[in-house]
Amino acid sequence: MNTLEALACNIPLVEDIPICPIMDARRSQVYNAIYKFKDGKAHTVVEPRALSVEELCAQIREKTIFVGDGVNVYRDKIATLCGDNAVFAPAHLTLQKASSVAYAASMADENEYLTPEALEVIYLRKSQAEREREERNG
């Protein structure tokens, strides 16, 4: 489970409507993914990634619920670019919540448990320092 999936779990009872959690990644980008719920379980439609808001909105083809701290930053731009396809979660559902992480964990299959040692961090893009070092070093 990742933070984006946990954010999608803020809205678990909406089935068959895509949920797009977005987190501000700075530099006019958002970390995002797209999930759909079926039978109370989140299914990944688009894997987590980092994109510009313009690139993300160009891929939105149906009504989609946006949730996450990126909504506060990019709401107007998303509304303009996605038009009627943009649906925004209520403010109290846009932040990460421990209860949503617990809900996401409860959806795991019975044999899908991980030990703490098996957990790993997933970085969707290199840090600014890494990118600048690569630019300097070719």
Residue ranges and their predicted role:
Residues 1-95, 123, 128:
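Surface "functional belts" at beta-alpha junctions
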Residues 89-138:
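Acyltransferase
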